[in-house]
Amino acid sequence: GIVLPSGLMLAYPNLRQEFNGDKMEWRYDKSTREIDRVYGAKVFQGTVQALARCVIGEAMVRIHNVYPLGLTLHDAVYLTVKDYQADEALKFVETEMCRAPVWLPEIILGVEGHIGKSLKEV
């Protein structure tokens, strides 16, 4: 497997080389009892998605310590706050979402934040 800077491990159970016709491929056992192949772009995509999950997961904990999370969706967090808290909450969320984790201090993160009365407005 691949150990990320956060300590999370990307596992490829029973990783092995197998012939597919006349070419050699890397294959692993998926959790659904299927066999899948591994190639560079798949490893890269999985690594990026896992790193993003770690970064946003840590940010969500920090945000939740101050404001209750209403909803998360992929790389977005949604809060329900009083109107008078909206600007302050948005600034706080943007700050926390851009904070680099201690295990990857050189990463540069960006964020877009919006205020609305409904999900449709945001």
Map each language-model feature to its residues.
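Conserved catalytic core of nucleotide polymerization and phosphodiester-bond processing enzymes
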Residues: 1-122
